[in-house]
Each structure stands twice: as structure tokens, then as C-alpha cells.
């Protein structure tokens, strides 16, 4: 009888131990499931975002503050984008992240070019620009060149980079010959959302653009015969600036709602034709000139040596071009075109397209695919 009691007690004890272990495991599993259910959504979202938009960091990952460099990626000009990125990344050891604004049908070409060449070392993110935001905001004159929507992407930097506080914007027809960190560190005065290089600076004003009157003043971009322009009280002889290179304080940009201010003047131009037709066909500079009138800081002139694309001749001396920190081929004569100024400087940084869709055009019609 006593033996049966002992046997029953042992069985009951074993059952209790089993139930305790089972209870513990169930609690642990419940905790794991609870944590997974609360964390899985953002983790999946972040992973998809990384795969969709970001190139993985290179093995020799660069440390320090992120320097955001924004460049448009237009299909027919991708050679310019690649050369610009190569020149920047080769001249700095800083943690540069390239934000390439493009369209969905160009993303694959960009990835192929950057990931399949020596540029696989760079870190970049592809940002899709929704051109529908421009509906009703861009006037198209009869006989004018087709509007290129990507040129307005610079107006929407805070929307495209919502978490970024400061960024550099560059057109795709530039070459950087110094450490981009120096440009990024350009001091911006309190209340200023951007820094530009004035057209009346000591560098560019010495080399006038042939045949262009009022080439460096507001009157060359805005129609001062219109009452709405005159009522702003802006002096017609105020120095203009080129918006192809600038440093932006995006925190201040958001605070002042600069994007909406720019859109306002775009819409008013559609209704009232406020831009001047005497100098150039620029439709991006006028709203920027209005919004940033006497409210922008200045870049070092050597960080925006421009007008190399205004003619096929050599505007500057070889010594000066070598000393420049950033060269800009704004104008019709691009460095990848048939004729241009100092194409050899640009070609130094060009990397041939692995897909064979882009090649510089040179004299006699041959394509030059050399680096």
C-alpha cells in the first residue's frame, strides 16, 4: 500500500513538473510572438526601402557626418551624372551619400552603371520624382523647347529628403575637383535657407557671355514691365545667381515653406507671364530669384565656376580651370557633346556605360568611350 502511494506521488510530481515547463514555454512563445507582431511591420518596410532605393555601403565604409549630395538623373544625360559622381567620390574621404532624383524607367540604367563599374564603392539612393506636382505650374510658350520636368526637382528637396537637415544640390553637368566637404561646410547666415554664387562675383563677371545683355542682373530674368514684379521692390540691377549649384539648409527651407513660395510664383507666371524673354529661356531661375531676393548666403566663387557651356571656345585659361574647385558646363555646349570647352577635363572622370546606351559625341562623329 505504501509502495502504491509513493508511485502515485512520483507520477503526480512528474505531472506538475511537466505542466510548469509547458507553461513556461508557452509564455516564452507568447512573448516572442508579441514582439514579432509589434516589430515586423517596420522591419519589413525598412528592408524593402533599402532594397528599393539604396545601394549597400561599400566595404570601406566611410565614417562621419553624412554629406547629402542631390543630383538629377535624366536618361539622355546619365553620362554627366556618372562623371559628376566619380569626380566627387574620388576627391573626398567624407561620408557622401548621393541622392539621385530620377524616374522609374531610368532606375535600372543607373543601377547598372553604378553597380557594374568602379562606382560600386559609392553610396547612393534613388528618389522618384512625381512630375504631376508640376501640373498647372509651368507655362509652355509656342515654339519653345520642351519643358524638362526634372529641372524643377530642386524646388522639392525637403519633400524628397524628409529626414535630411542640410544638402548640396548639383546639376549633372558639373565636375568637382576638390573635397566636397568644403562646399558642404559653407556657412549660411541665420534665416537663410540656401547659399548660391552671385553672377557678379569677381570670377564670372570678368568673362561676359557673348551677346547677352543684362546677363548678370534680375532684369535679364524678370519682366519689369509687369506691375506684379515692380511691386516687389526688387532692384532691376541686382545681381542674379545660377541655381545649378547651391547648399540648402532644409530645416530653414521647411520653416519658411520655400517650396510653396516657389510654386506660387510658378502659378502666377502661368497666368501673367512674369519671366523675361530677353536673356534666356530659363524657367527655373526666376522664381528662385524672387523668393531668395536678398535672403541667401554666398558660395566661394571657386566652388561654382560656370558658363563653360556658353560657347565651344575656351572661356578661361587652363591654369584657372585647374585651380577651380567646381566646373559647370551650363549652356548648350555640354562636355559630352560634339564641341565643348575643356572636354578633356570632363572625360577624365567619365566611365563608359556598361549597357552601351550612352557615349560622348566627338568631332568627326566618332564616339569616345575612354575614361
Swiss-Prot record:
Q: What is its EC number?
A: 2.4.1.-
Is Cell membrane among the key words of this record?
no
Q: Which GO terms describe its molecular function?
A: UDP-glycosyltransferase activity
Lumenal topology ranges: 29-371
Q: Which cellular compartments is it found in?
A: Membrane
> Which cysteine-cysteine pairs are annotated as disulfide bonds in the entry?
none
The transmembrane segments are 8-28
A GO cellular component annotated for this chain's UniProt record is: membrane
Xref: SUPFAM superfamilies:
Nucleotide-diphospho-sugar transferases
Supply the CDD domains for this chain: GT8_like_1
Query: Which Pfam families would you find in this protein's record?
Result: Glyco_transf_8 (PF01501)
- Annotated InterPro entries: Glyco_trans_8, Glycosyltrans_8_dom-fam, Nucleotide-diphossugar_trans
Report keywords, A-Z.
Glycoprotein, Glycosyltransferase, Membrane, Signal-anchor, Transferase, Transmembrane, Transmembrane helix
What are the annotated glycosylation sites? 104, 249, 257
The topology of this chain with respect to the membrane is: Single-pass type II membrane protein
Asked whether the keyword DNA-binding is assigned, the reply is no
> Which segments sit on the Cytoplasmic face?
1-7
Annotated family: Belongs to the glycosyltransferase 8 family.
| PANTHER family in the cross-refs | GLYCOSYLTRANSFERASE 8 DOMAIN-CONTAINING PROTEIN (PTHR13778), GLYCOSYLTRANSFERASE 8 DOMAIN-CONTAINING PROTEIN 1 (PTHR13778:SF3)
Q: What is this protein called?
A: Glycosyltransferase 8 domain-containing protein 1
Please give the organism: Xenopus tropicalis
Amino acid at each position: 500500500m505504501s509502495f502504491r502511494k509513493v508511485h502515485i506521488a512520483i507520477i503526480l510530481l512528474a505531472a506538475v513538473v511537466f505542466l510548469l515547463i509547458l507553461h513556461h514555454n508557452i509564455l516564452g512563445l507568447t512573448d516572442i510572438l508579441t514582439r514579432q507582431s509589434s516589430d515586423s511591420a517596420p522591419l519589413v518596410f525598412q528592408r524593402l526601402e533599402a532594397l528599393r532605393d539604396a545601394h549597400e555601403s561599400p566595404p570601406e565604409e566611410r565614417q562621419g557626418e553624412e554629406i547629402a549630395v542631390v543630383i538629377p538623373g535624366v536618361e539622355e544625360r546619365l553620362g554627366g551624372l556618372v562623371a559628376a559622381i566619380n569626380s566627387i567620390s574620388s576627391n573626398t574621404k567624407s561620408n557622401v551619400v548621393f541622392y539621385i532624383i530620377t524616374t522609374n524607367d531610368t532606375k535600372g540604367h543607373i543601377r547598372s552603371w553604378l553597380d557594374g563599374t568602379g562606382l560600386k564603392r559609392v553610396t547612393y539612393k534613388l528618389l522618384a520624382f512625381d512630375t504631376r506636382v508640376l501640373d498647372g505650374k509651368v507655362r509652355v510658350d509656342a515654339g519653345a523647347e520642351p519643358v524638362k520636368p526634372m529641372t524643377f526637382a530642386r524646388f522639392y528637396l525637403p519633400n524628397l529628403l524628409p529626414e535630411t537637415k542640410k544638402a548640396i544640390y548639383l546639376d549633372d553637368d558639373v565636375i568637382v575637383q576638390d573635397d566636397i566637404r568644403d562646399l558642404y561646410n559653407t556657412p549660411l547666415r541665420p534665416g537663410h535657407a540656401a547659399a548660391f554664387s552671385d553672377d557678379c562675383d569677381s570670377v564670372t563677371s570678368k568673362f561676359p557671355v557673348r551677346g547677352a545683355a543684362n546677363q548678370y542682373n534680375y532684369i535679364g530674368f524678370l519682366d519689369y514691365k509687369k506691375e506684379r514684379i515692380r511691386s516687389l521692390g526688387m532692384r532691376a540691377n541686382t545681381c542674379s545667381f545660377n541655381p545649378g549649384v547651391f547648399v540648402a539648409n532644409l530645416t530653414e527651407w521647411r520653416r519658411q515653406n520655400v517650396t510653396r513660395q516657389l510654386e506660387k510664383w510658378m502659378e502666377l507666371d502661368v497666368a501673367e507671364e512674369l519671366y523675361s524673354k530677353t536673356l534666356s529661356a530659363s524657367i527655373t531661375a526666376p522664381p528662385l530669384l524672387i523668393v531668395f531676393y536678398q535672403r541667401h548666403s554666398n558660395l566661394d566663387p571657386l566652388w561654382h565656376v560656370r558658363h563653360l557651356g556658353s560657347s565651344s571656345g575656351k572661356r578661361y585659361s587652363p591654369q584657372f580651370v585647374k585651380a577651380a574647385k567646381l566646373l559647370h558646363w551650363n549652356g548648350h555646349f555640354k562636355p559630352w557633346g560634339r564641341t565643348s570647352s575643356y572636354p578633356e577635363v570632363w572625360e577624365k572622370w567619365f566611365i563608359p556605360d556598361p549597357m552601351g546606351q550612352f557615349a560622348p559625341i566627338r568631332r568627326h562623329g566618332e564616339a569616345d568611350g575612354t575614361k
